[in-house]
C-alpha cells in the first residue's frame, strides 16, 4: 500500500510539474481603424494609453501582409494568426455559393434579444481555429471566451467557434443582441444591461463617445457575470471598439468627432485596466491592443495642404467597365459584382452566351485599368504573369480565397482614395502604409516593458499569445511569436 501511495504521489507531482504556467485571462482589445501613428498623435491622460505605452511591449512596425485591409478580415486574422487565403473571411462581404453574403451571415440561425426574426449570424464562415478555440482544446474545454463589440463581425470572429457568448449592437432594436448559434435567450445580465442603458444605446452610438463607453461597460459586465479569469483554466475576453471606424468613415481622420471618441477611449481603457487589476491582478492577465486595419486620409484633407491624392469610386467603375464590355461582346452585366477592391465575373452570362472566358477576363482587366487612378487590374489566377512587385503579389495571394474573392483585384495608385472627392470621411482597404500599418502592444503577464522596430505582422499576434500560453497555434497560423 505504501509503495502504491508513493507511485501515485510521484505521478501527481510529475503531472503538476508538466503543467505550464498560464495567466488567468487573456484580453484582446482591437480598435477599429486605429492608425499606428495615433499612438503618438494624441495627448493621453493617466492610466490608459499612457500605461500601455510605458508598461507594455510595443511593436512599432506591425504590418498587415494581405489585402483587402478591412474589418472582418482583420479581426479574423488577428485571432487566427493567418490570412483570408486560409481562414476564408475574404472581406466584410464576399460571394458564397453564388450569393453576396456578410462575413458572419448564417441563414440557418436567427437573432436573439432584439427582433428575433432577424437573420442569424455565426462564425461558421471562418474555417480555421482561433486563439479561443486552441485554449479550449488545450484545457479540455474548460476555458471560456466572450466577444463584445458594436459590430457583429467584430464580436463574433474573435470569440471563436465555441464561446460562452458573443454580443453586438442591433440598431433596429437599440440593444445588444446575439444569435441562436450561441443561445436561445439573452442572459439576464445582458437583458438588464439593455434595460438600464436603453437611452444611451438608442443614441448615436456609432458617432459619439457613448458607443465606446457602452462597449467597455458591457465587457465589464461580461467579466463579472461570466466570472472570466476566476476558473481553473485561462479565459479570453475579446473587445472591439467599433465606433472609431464608423465615425472616421463619416467625418474623417482627426476630425473633432473622431478625436472625442479617442479621448473617451483613453479613459475607458484606464478604467478597464483598473478593473482588471482589482479583479484579476496585473500579473495574472495578458492584454494585447491592436487594430484590424488603419485608415487613409480623405481627398479634401490631403489636397487642402497640397499633398498628392486622387479618388476612385468602385460602383462607378463597375458601371463604366460593364459598358465597355457590352460594346465589345454585346452582353450586359459581364461583371456581376464588386466589393473590397475585387470584381466578380458573371459566369452565368459568359457561359449562356458562349463567350470565351479568357477573352472576357482580359477585356475586363483592360476596362478596369482605363482610369488613370488604377495602376493594375489583376487576374488573380494568373497574377505571376503581371509585372508588379513581388511583395504586392504576395499580399494579393494571401488575401485571395477561391470562390469567395473576386477574380479580379484592383490595385489603385499609391495615395488614391476610394470614394468621391467631396467625401470628408476616411477609408481603407489597400496595401499602403496608411491602411496596413497598425499598432501592437502587449502588457501584463510575463511581459517586460520595451519596444521593437523590427518587422512584425498582424498574424504574429495569435502566434505570440499561443506560444506564451504553451498551447498549439491555430491550425492555419502562419505567424511567428514576437518574443523569444
State what each model feature region is.
Residues 83, 91-233, 241-249, 370-372, ...:
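His/Asp/Glu-rich, glycine-adjacent segments
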Amino acid at each position: 500500500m505504501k509503495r502504491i501511495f508513493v507511485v501515485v504521489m510521484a505521478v501527481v507531482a510529475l503531472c503538476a510539474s508538466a503543467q505550464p504556467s498560464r495567466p488567468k485571462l487573456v484580453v484582446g482589445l482591437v480598435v477599429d481603424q486605429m492608425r499606428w501613428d495615433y499612438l503618438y498623435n494624441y495627448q493621453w491622460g493617466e492610466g490608459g494609453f499612457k500605461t500601455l505605452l510605458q508598461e507594455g511591449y510595443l511593436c512599432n512596425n506591425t504590418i498587415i501582409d494581405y489585402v483587402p485591409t478591412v474589418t472582418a478580415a482583420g479581426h479574423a486574422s488577428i485571432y487566427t494568426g493567418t490570412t483570408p487565403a486560409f481562414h476564408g473571411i475574404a472581406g466584410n462581404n464576399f460571394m458564397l455559393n453564388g450569393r453576396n453574403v456578410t462575413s458572419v451571415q448564417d441563414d440557418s440561425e436567427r437573432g436573439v434579444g432584439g427582433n428575433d426574426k432577424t437573420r442569424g449570424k455565426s462564425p461558421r464562415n471562418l474555417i480555421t481555429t482561433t486563439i479561443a478555440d486552441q485554449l479550449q482544446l488545450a484545457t479540455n474545454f474548460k476555458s471560456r471566451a466572450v466577444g463584445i463589440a458594436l459590430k457583429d463581425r467584430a464580436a463574433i470572429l474573435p470569440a471563436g467557434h465555441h464561446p460562452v457568448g458573443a454580443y453586438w449592437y442591433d440598431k433596429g432594436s437599440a440593444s445588444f443582441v446575439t444569435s441562436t448559434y450561441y443561445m436561445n435567450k439573452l442572459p439576464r445580465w445582458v437583458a438588464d444591461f439593455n434595460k438600464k442603458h436603453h437611452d444611451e444605446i438608442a443614441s448615436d452610438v456609432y458617432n459619439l463617445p457613448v458607443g465606446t463607453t457602452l462597449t467597455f461597460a458591457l465587457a465589464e459586465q461580461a467579466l463579472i457575470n461570466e466570472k472570466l479569469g476566476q476558473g481553473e483554466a485561462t479565459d479570453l475576453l475579446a473587445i472591439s471598439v467599433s465606433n472609431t471606424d464608423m465615425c472616421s468613415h463619416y467625418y474623417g481622420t482627426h476630425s473633432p468627432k473622431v478625436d472625442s471618441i479617442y479621448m473617451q477611449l483613453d479613459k475607458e481603457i484606464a478604467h478597464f485596466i483598473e478593473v482588471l487589476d482589482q479583479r484579476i491582478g496585473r500579473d495574472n492577465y495578458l492584454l494585447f491592443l491592436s487594430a484590424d486595419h488603419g485608415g487613409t486620409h480623405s481627398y479634401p484633407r490631403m489636397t487642402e495642404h497640397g499633398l498628392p491624392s486622387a479618388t476612385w469610386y468602385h460602383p462607378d467603375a463597375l458601371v463604366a467597365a460593364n459598358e465597355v464590355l457590352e460594346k465589345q461582346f454585346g452582353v450586359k452585366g459581364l461583371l456581376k459584382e464588386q466589393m473590397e477592391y475585387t470584381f466578380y465575373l458573371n459566369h452565368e452570362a459568359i457561359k449562356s452566351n458562349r463567350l470565351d472566358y479568357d477573352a472576357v477576363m482580359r477585356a475586363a482587366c483592360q476596362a478596369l485599368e482605363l482610369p488613370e487612378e488604377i495602376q493594375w487590374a489583376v487576374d488573380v489566377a494568373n497574377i505571376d504573369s503581371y509585372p508588379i512587385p513581388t511583395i504586392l503579389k504576395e499580399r494579393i495571394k494571401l488575401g485571395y480565397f477561391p470562390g469567395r474573392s473576386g477574380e479580379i483585384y484592383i490595385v489603385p495608385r499609391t495615395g488614391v482614395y476610394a470614394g468621391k472627392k467631396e467625401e470628408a470621411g476616411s477609408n481603407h482597404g489597400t496595401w499602403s502604409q496608411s491602411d496596413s500599418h497598425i499598432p501592437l502592444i502587449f502588457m501584463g503577464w510575463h511581459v517586460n516593458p520595451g519596444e521593437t522596430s523590427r518587422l512584425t505582422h498582424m498574424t504574429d499576434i495569435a502566434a505570440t499569445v499561443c506560444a506564451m500560453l504553451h498551447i498549439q497555434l491555430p491550425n492555419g497560423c502562419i505567424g511567428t511569436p514576437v518574443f523569444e
